[in-house]
């Protein structure tokens, strides 16, 4: 027993040496996780379009990761990966309804066990059983051969006036609570604290006019925040013609209700409103930073800012997430605090599963086995560190939810982004050279078959994606069949009332037949 205790103390001290801390002087840890924040806005030239003073402050005094990715571009699976430190296919977090068990171990649990005073506030969204029935059914039926609009058409909504700072009241309320907790609780603590604050912004708001099942397609802000946006810097992204789109991207464009006509003014306004919502998010980050500063905790606290995914904001003729394009999959990741390099940029691809081992290193807690990620501390520490398990040169993401009609797998390495689908045979892959094609408009997979072959081999060493795709396909059918049987005679009425109801009612019987034929192949 004594030997185990001595080894534990040795390990804690060894980890704390990474950042010149002792086991008795561990840092506080504060993580702010937004929702749908485009990571490209956190570094030049992306942040020229909108004023983000507190993100810029973190970048100047800390380290920013230039190629940080979600492990699944949708809310719940992404957060499940971040909290568990495991890839989505390992936890089988297939969609917004199927994620972690409520009792799953998270890095916050490990911090609490190691002596931290822990507190989580706001949006968590990493356990199973949540989100709307419509969202679940759309995910389960994504490979049924019909094409229905599932989202409201993206729109803008300007509220208040030039003095209206608080638009997303729910987020401001929880931010106020976090600020009060810092001001009123932390001073009396005898141990370090770990605070998690989850925000909803800049996720678009639900479009109430579309009914209770509607998704988030309203970009809402006030003149106060819109004034933070340089409107003349807001670009109108180029779109491929429908016939030139990848089949999965075309499906996404239609189901997201973006296949109709949009004027340049509409597109620019949607993007400007989205950037304004990012500015409001930055304002909440600033409130937390001010509370840490005013209580004398800032110089003893490591602060992390990230997001579960981004938002396409009309790039590739889409909004929302659910895509491996940069606007959707590229997330912010900034870390500042004692021992962290200042004004430092990390170009190595990383992802949200890296947060778990990173937080353990920050706290001087020995690493947990079975994690998919790697600690980022050796990359940003002011002290030169030799890592026994250096971070790989790639980042990996996967998607199995709604608004994409097959499972999607993305590998990001060097200048390449490789995207594979389904079993790797029936849907063609995509390959982009991001150093030459930042807008991802030129799929060069057919021009570089050797690169695709090499990257596909690497991808298969990470995940047996044909087998995973088959498992998800089987799960979707089983879940839908159970849901259908539970409804009995009300099935036709209920399925017709979901978010696709506008298109569904045009030929309800035909769509029901499509589903019945799909179910006949139940594995």
Swiss-Prot record:
GO terms for cellular component: extracellular region; lysosome. It catalyses: an aryl sulfate + H2O = a phenol + sulfate + H(+); Hydrolysis of the 2-sulfate groups of the 2-O-sulfo-D-glucuronate residues of chondroitin sulfate, heparin and heparitin sulfate. Keywords: Calcium, Glycoprotein, Hydrolase, Lysosome, Metal-binding, Secreted, Signal. Disulfide bonds: none annotated. The conversion to 3-oxoalanine (also known as C-formylglycine, FGly), of a serine or cysteine residue in prokaryotes and of a cysteine residue in eukaryotes, is critical for catalytic activity. Ca(2+) binds at residues 35, 75, 308-309. The active site is at 75 (nucleophile). It is found in: Secreted; Lysosome. It comes from the Eukaryota. Its cofactor is Ca(2+). The keyword Secreted applies. InterPro entries: Alkaline_phosphatase_core_sf, ARSK, GAG-degrading_sulfatase, Sulfatase_N. It is an enzyme of class 3 (hydrolase). Its main location: secreted. The keyword Signal applies. Catalyzes the hydrolysis of pseudosubstrates such as p-nitrocatechol sulfate and p-nitrophenyl sulfate. Catalyzes the hydrolysis of the 2-sulfate groups of the 2-O-sulfo-D-glucuronate residues of chondroitin sulfate, heparin and heparitin sulfate. Acts selectively on 2-sulfoglucuronate and lacks activity against 2-sulfoiduronate. Belongs to the sulfatase family. PANTHER family: ARYLSULFATASE K. This is Arylsulfatase K. The gene is arsk.
């Amino acid at each position: 027993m004594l030997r185990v205790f001595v080894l534990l103390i040795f390990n804690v001290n060894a980890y704390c040496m990474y950042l010149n801390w002792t086991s008795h002087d561990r840092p506080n840890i504060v993580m702010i996780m937004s929702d749908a924040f485009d990571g490209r806005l956190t570094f030049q030239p992306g942040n020229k379009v909108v004023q983000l003073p507190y993100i810029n402050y973190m970048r100047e005094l800390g380290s920013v990761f230039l190629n940080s990715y979600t492990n699944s571009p949708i809310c719940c699976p992404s957060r499940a990966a971040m909290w568990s430190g495991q890839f989505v296919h390992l936890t089988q977090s297939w969609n917004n309804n199927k994620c972690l068990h409520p009792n799953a171990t998270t890095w916050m649990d490990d911090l609490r066990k190691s002596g931290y005073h822990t507190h989580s506030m706001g949006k968590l969204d990493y356990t199973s059983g949540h989100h709307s029935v419509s969202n679940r059914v759309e995910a389960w039926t994504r490979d049924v051969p019909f094409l229905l609009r599932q989202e409201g058409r993206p729109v803008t909504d300007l509220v208040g006036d030039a003095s209206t700072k608080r638009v997303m009241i729910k987020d401001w309320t929880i931010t106020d609570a976090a600020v009060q907790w810092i001001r009123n609780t932390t001073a009396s603590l005898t141990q370090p604290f770990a605070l998690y604050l989850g925000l909803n912004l800049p996720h678009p708001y639900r479009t109430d006019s579309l009914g209770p099942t509607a998704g988030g397609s309203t970009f809402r802000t006030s003149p106060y925040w819109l004034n933070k946006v340089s409107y003349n810097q807001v670009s109108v992204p180029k779109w491929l013609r429908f016939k030139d789109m990848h089949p999965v991207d075309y499906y996404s464009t239609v189901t997201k209700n973006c296949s109709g006509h949009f004027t340049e003014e509409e597109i620019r306004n949607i993007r400007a409103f989205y950037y304004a919502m990012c500015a409001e998010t930055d304002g909440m980050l600033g409130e937390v930073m001010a509370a840490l500063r005013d209580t004398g905790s800032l110089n003893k606290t490591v602060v992390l800012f990230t997001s579960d995914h981004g938002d396409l904001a009309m790039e590739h003729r889409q909004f929302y997430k659910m895509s491996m394009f940069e606007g959707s999959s590229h997330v912010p990741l900034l870390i500042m605090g004692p021992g962290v390099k200042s004004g430092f940029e990390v170009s190595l691809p990383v992802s949200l599963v890296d947060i778990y081992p990173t937080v353990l290193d920050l706290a001087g807690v020995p690493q947990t086995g079975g994690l998919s990620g790697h600690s980022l501390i050796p990359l940003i520490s002011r002290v030169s560190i030799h890592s026994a398990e250096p971070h790989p040169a790639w980042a990996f993401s996967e998607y199995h939810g709604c608004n994409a009609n097959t499972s999607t797998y993305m590998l990001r390495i060097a200048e390449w982004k490789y995207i594979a689908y389904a079993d790797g045979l029936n849907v063609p892959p995509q390959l982009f050279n991001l150093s030459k094609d930042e807008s991802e408009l030129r799929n060069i997979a057919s021009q570089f078959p050797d690169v695709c072959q090499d990257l596909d081999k690497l991808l298969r060493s990470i995940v047996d994606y044909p087998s995973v795709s088959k498992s998800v396909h089987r799960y979707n059918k089983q879940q839908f069949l159970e849901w259908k049987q539970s409804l009995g005679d009300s099935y036709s009425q209920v399925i017709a009332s979901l978010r696709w109801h506008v298109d569904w009612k045009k030929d309800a019987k035909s769509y029901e037949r499509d589903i019945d034929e799909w179910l006949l192949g139940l594995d």
